Amino acid sequence: MSTVEPNVYDPHQVETSAQQFWDATRAFQVDENSEKPKFYCLSMLPYPSGALHMGHVRNYTISDVVSRYKRMTGHNVLQPMGWDAFGLPAENAAIKNKTAPAKWTYANIAHMRAQLKSLGYAIDWSREFATCTPDYYVHEQRMFTRLMRKGLAYRRNAVVNWDPIDQTVLANEQVIDGRGWRSGAVVEKREIPQWFLRITDYAQELLDGLDQLDGWPDSVKTMQRNWIGRSEGLEIQFDVRDTNGAALDPLRVFTTRPDTLMGVTFVSIAAEHPLALHAAKSNPELAALLETLKHGGVSEAELETQEKRGMATGLTAVHPISGEQVPVWVANFVLMGYGTGAVMAVPGHDQRDFEFANKYGLPIVQVVKLREPRNDDEQRWDATEWRDWYTDKSRELELINSAEFDGLDFGGAFEALAERFERKGQGQRRVNYRLRDWGVSRQRYWGCPIPVIYCPKCGAVPVPEDQLPVVLPENVEFACTGSPIKTDPTWRQTTCPDCGGPAERETDTFDTFMESSWYVARYTSPNAREMVDRRANYWMPADLYVGGIEHAILHLMYFRFYHKLMRDARLVDSDEPVTNLLTQGMVIADTFYRDADNGGKDWINPADVEIQRDERGRVTGAVLIADGQPVHIGGTEKMSKSKNNGVDPQSMVAKYGADTVRLFSMFAAPPEQSLEWNEAGVDGMARFMRRLWAQVHKHVGEGAAVALDVAALSAEQKAIRRKTHETIGKVSDDYGRRHSFNTAIAAVMELSNALAKFDDASDQGRAVRQEALEAMVLLLNPITPHASHALWQVLGRGETLLENVAFPQADVSALVRDALTLAVQINGKLRGTIDVAADAAREQIEALAQAEPNAAKFLDGLSVRKIIIVPGKIVNIVAG
């Protein structure tokens, strides 16, 4: 048993003792040989940046609270930890610090592991891995070669977002306002060879699967549905003529609004479209525009906000119904990577086309009207003023100016046009998706090598499995740009596995989302020779996944897709990787600054600022502690380095102890909401911990408590016991169903306050207090496990792993107020009695009757058909 100074709460001594016990007993190491139901709980694995931030602490504490609670409710719980260790920050740090990325990464992992352990998380460290090690990434290399052979991994030229500073391709989501998310450089368009995974082959399954994810937030599912972007429409062929009237390759366009076809007045194509390149050969002005457009982004979000630009190509498209020739324009809002790189422009019923047509003086024709306009404005159509109803497909519409299609509604026009084009071979019905195939190539060094060899004779050849892993050299000299493996001939040059001739390795590395797309499964099978083994099907799918909503589209989409690839490779049985998803809110804090000489702001850390308040406690200003001079208050924002408003978790642990930091991070806000960091609030949690510590020691110092005799309790004693069991019931629900940890803590605090006012020193008074204190210690254990570990011993229960102690269960009989005694009958025969409140609800009476021990014995194996209650006398359960 650990020893601590009585009545003095020393969190560091308490926490060291508890952590030593957990380490010595390997308390949180689990296996699959358990009769308990499994529960797999994890947080999104961290990038080893060098230090934990408060966002990490909140994320991992949420997971830990749930994990510890589930252990106490009889589950076999897996809570692992690893490191998402590849990525650009390591390369940037290597350049800055003149050290190899591997050395920087492994040092950071060691430091952050120690930080996590100091917070007392119930992690099975035997399953730890870093994704940058060959024994991890060999498995994704092997999977990739198998996907190549199945045609699910392929290489093609693609127009990409190119960051000229970081010398790498960026995903659309990594381009912010036309600039690279890390470097800030203006992003260019480039066409380069890229490796892709065919996520589009799984688009419909990814969409349908969202309907089965009842435990995921609706907001995340909506974001994924929108990103997948399923749409039904027609693909229509437009014949194309050059300036001399000669036929060129036809254009195929996809539209969800074929009813507006007669309103087509031009066709727009992407700057990279073959027809645009063809036209530019004889048009220097067009060629110059195409070169300029290379520097625009390729994300849809950018296209929505940027100025519409374009130029006529001199080519014409033949309208497939009227035969009229309409001009073909290059437009900067058309992407080659989306659809066919061409769209039919209907400026009368598409706002983007409307703006473009008005800018360049192109015709605008109305071909749809509202059948039942709601006002005069909806009866007017103006080619110079956009109105939302022009494109509102949800309203009842009718075609006009559309020849034989006049009078049809949307559905009728769709069917008529589909039948016509399919009969004439000019088009077909088609389902289209906004989702694009996943480009997994990155032109960086610090990533998993793509296991491909290029042979002049054989082409792209997957590295044979017996030659895997392709190991990334870690001891490299790092330059400011590019990749050291590109300039290392000893690594790059090799032989072709097919013909034995000279060949070269692929020098691109995988997008780091590859590693984080399957790591959840790897935790289940540490050290397995394959990617996973049979243990994966014991643990998968994970029961709870905790992480930020900012990962809703990228990580969580790839994560689901890769799991389906593993399923189809017969590595796992489940369709989805995670059953329940909890997206925690941000951690925010006050910001302070002074105006800088360059017109910017010098941000000041809150720890260096003193807040000034008036006599009513209202904030009146702030001063820098160092010089006493005023600083500006900038409001509350997400903790970040840029705003210098972060709080170092280690300094908080050093000052208050891990339990207090954990307690505040769970108390300050519900998990899904933003948490405003406030050290005064941390102070309040520290006071509560000291008060609880003192309550337990004062009680124990007054002598041993006798056994509780419920029948002998006074009204006041019953009231305290009722409060205890009401708290147990609420906290159980808050932990298990609602994940409402702040209200659970508040309930325990209320019980503590009630107990402080209860000064009954009689034997049964002390017995009631003993029960209440034991309950409080156990109820808080998921959040404050170190203090609970110590206080359980102080209460005379010995040193043990509290996660193996059953979570308290509310005694329903203790909840009764002004009890009545009711006879409990099973099919008319007396089987017991229950005490219920005079105003007890029917549901409570029914539950108590069925829970009565003798009645429960007679009900075993029977189905309850109905329950008859004679008020104040009898509960008759009819069962059979």
Swiss-Prot record:
Any one of the GO BP annotations: leucyl-tRNA aminoacylation
Q: Which CDD domains match?
A: Anticodon_Ia_Leu_BEm, LeuRS_core
Question: Which annotated residues bind ATP?
Answer: 641
Enzyme Commission number(s) of this protein? 6.1.1.4
The GO terms describing molecular function are: aminoacyl-tRNA deacylase activity; ATP binding; leucine-tRNA ligase activity
**Keyword Nucleotide-binding on this protein?**
yes
Which ranges belong to the motif 'HIGH' region?
46-56
What this protein catalyses is:
tRNA(Leu) + L-leucine + ATP = L-leucyl-tRNA(Leu) + AMP + diphosphate
Ranges spanned by the short sequence motif 'KMSKS' region, renumbered to the chain:
638-642
Any one GO CC term of this protein is: cytosol
Protein location = Cytoplasm
> Enzyme group, top EC level?
ligase
Query: Mind listing the UniProt keywords for this protein, alphabetically?
Result: Aminoacyl-tRNA synthetase, ATP-binding, Cytoplasm, Ligase, Nucleotide-binding, Protein biosynthesis
> This protein's superkingdom?
Bacteria
The record's section on PANTHER family has: LEUCINE--TRNA LIGASE, MITOCHONDRIAL, LEUCYL-TRNA SYNTHETASE
| Assigned protein family | Belongs to the class-I aminoacyl-tRNA synthetase family.
Q: What is this protein identified as?
A: Leucine--tRNA ligase
| Higher taxonomy | Bacteria, Pseudomonadati, Pseudomonadota, Gammaproteobacteria, Lysobacterales
